[in-house]
Regions:
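Low-complexity, acidic/polar, glycine-enriched regions of mature
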Residues: 23-194
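Bacterial N-terminal signal peptides
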Residues: 7-18
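N-terminal secretory signal peptides that target proteins for export/translocation
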Residues: 1-5
């Protein structure tokens, strides 16, 4: 079994909201660990793209589809990073990058969801990484709620992404040697209505 990743976000988390199924009250959604993780990608010397994921994402999502309101509070365990390369994973966890010994979790918090008509488009929030907190807006690439037969309740999920400048959080490794500052983060989320 591979470790579980988000991202970043991540991330993200988020708006497990059903714009199609109207309910008058705010509901809590529990994350589905089998379908929730975060990934990141960064250019590697213009030759390839390094990718990895965090598989351990926990937290809560609250959503009111009628009011088009909600909140997200997600925690990512940094040690759950998985790139497919043991050596690269160890470097990602080192003080050069995520410094997992000092900063074992990432956190994304959002107090609002942005809709365009009935469609969820953004989840603006705050990302805490390496002990620093800065705003990040996750863009909804897809989002849907549906009746989940296995869980016997409504499930909502989607893919959300953002591009961040890692140096805002003090992750400066090799920037002075030409490595990019920008990192694409994606949060894949599914959650069950409680």
């Amino acid at each position: 079994m591979r470790p579980r990743l988000p991202t970043f976000v991540g991330l993200a988390l988020l708006a497990l909201l059903d714009v199609g199924v109207a309910r008058a009250e705010s509901a809590i959604y529990a994350l589905d660990a089998d379908h929730t993780y975060a990934t990141f990608a960064i250019d590697h010397n213009g030759a390839s793209v390094n990718r990895a994921r965090f598989d351990e994402v926990a937290g809560s999502v609250r959503f009111d589809p009628v009011a088009k309101a909600g909140a997200v509070d997600l925690y990512v365990q940094v040690a759950s990073v998985y790139s497919g390369s043991k050596g690269f994973d160890e470097h990602l966890l080192s003080p050069d990058l995520f410094d997992a010994a000092r900063f074992p979790t990432l956190r994304f918090v959002s107090e609002r969801l942005v809709f365009d008509g009935g469609r969820l488009v953004e989840v603006p929030g705050q990302l805490t990484l390496l002990g620093r907190t800065h705003p990040v807006t996750l863009k909804a690439r897809q989002f849907r709620c549906y009746p989940n037969q296995r869980a016997k309740t409504e499930a909502c999920g989607g893919d959300f992404e953002a591009v961040i400048d890692r140096t805002q959080w003090g992750m400066n490794y090799l920037v002075d040697k030409g490595m990019p500052r920008n990192v694409r983060i994606t949060a894949t989320i599914e959650a069950f209505r409680q």
